[in-house]
Amino acid sequence: MHAFNSTHYYTDDNEDLRYWNGTILGPMQSCFENRIYSLSIEAGERYPMEPPTVKFITKINLPSCVDQRNGYVDLGKIGVTRGWTQQNSISDVLGAIFHAMARSENRKLSQPPEGTEF
């Protein structure tokens, strides 16, 4: 399963490149299919030496890596922090989240109603 064209990110402010918006199209043949997930991404002062902070805006049930109280993604649980170098990017992070959503153990999780947010 490829994340190609299933993840996107953009900024609303070309002056401040710390804050980004992201979207993930739910993987096909999963409980996430036909859903668009919105995320907020903060590339801190140490980015790209350190990965960004990522938070789901759209409510999602993905307890293997998403804090169910606030939507923050634990990047360590999906292998993003291990081996991170300054050549890695926001695209890599979103791709790793997409692949976590596509894992067999996550494909059938019941999901909150569409349109709900953290």
What do the PLM-derived regions correspond to, one by one?
Residues 8-9, 18, 36, 46, ...:
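Intrinsically disordered, low-complexity N-terminal regions enriched in serine/proline/glycine
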